[in-house]
Amino acid sequence: ALPIFKNNFNVEVLIPSEYKILKDTSTLFWATYNPDKEEVIKQLLVFSFIPKSANLQQEVLQKTDSILAQYLKGAKQEQYVKIESEFPPYYNNNIYKGIWKLEKGFMGGPLLAKTYFVGDKIIVSVGLVFDPNSRKRKHLKILEAIL
């Protein structure tokens, strides 16, 4: 595991070595776990923004939805990942727990997001799990530790 985020986001997070880093810029960090022999996909995304709204929780969810739709696409062009609006995420102590779904598709699973306040920015770290054949608790506990 390597500390990755200290330079770009001023938050130190350890990424397990089995994750593949897909993007590491000053605006977005994205890593994925997608082994060949398992039907498991885990995504980690970290981004930041300067809040402009009085409703901070809503703004965090909107920004997260926007990032998910931009980077996590399905097999078809019109498919993208979004936060499931039928079950709004539960929020407590800067942690959001909810469900994601593939728009115009048949995938979904748990979503976990943590927010950190650094100066005038909010840093959002998001983890998603897709594992249709098992319970997700173990995956979520690992994501919670990473984020």
Identify the meaning behind each predicted range.
Residues A1, V13, Y19, I123-L147:
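Surface-exposed amphipathic alpha-helical segments
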Residues A1-P3, P35-D36:
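Charge-rich, low-complexity N-terminal segments
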Residues K6-P16:
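N-terminal helix-cap/turn-to-beta initiation motif at the start of protein domains
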Residues P16-A69:
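Secretory pathway targeting signatures of secreted, lumenal, and periplasmic proteins
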Residues I21, A31, G98, V124-S125:
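Short hydrophobic/aromatic-rich beta-strand segments that constitute the beta-sheet cores
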Residues Y33-K37, K101-L102, L128-V129:
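Secondary-structure transition/turn motif
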Residues E38-I41, S53-A54, K104-G108, P132-K138:
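Short, surface-exposed beta-strand/loop "edge" segments at domain boundaries and coil↔beta transitions
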Residues A69-I122, S134:
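Signature of long, low-cysteine stretches enriched in small and polar/charged residues
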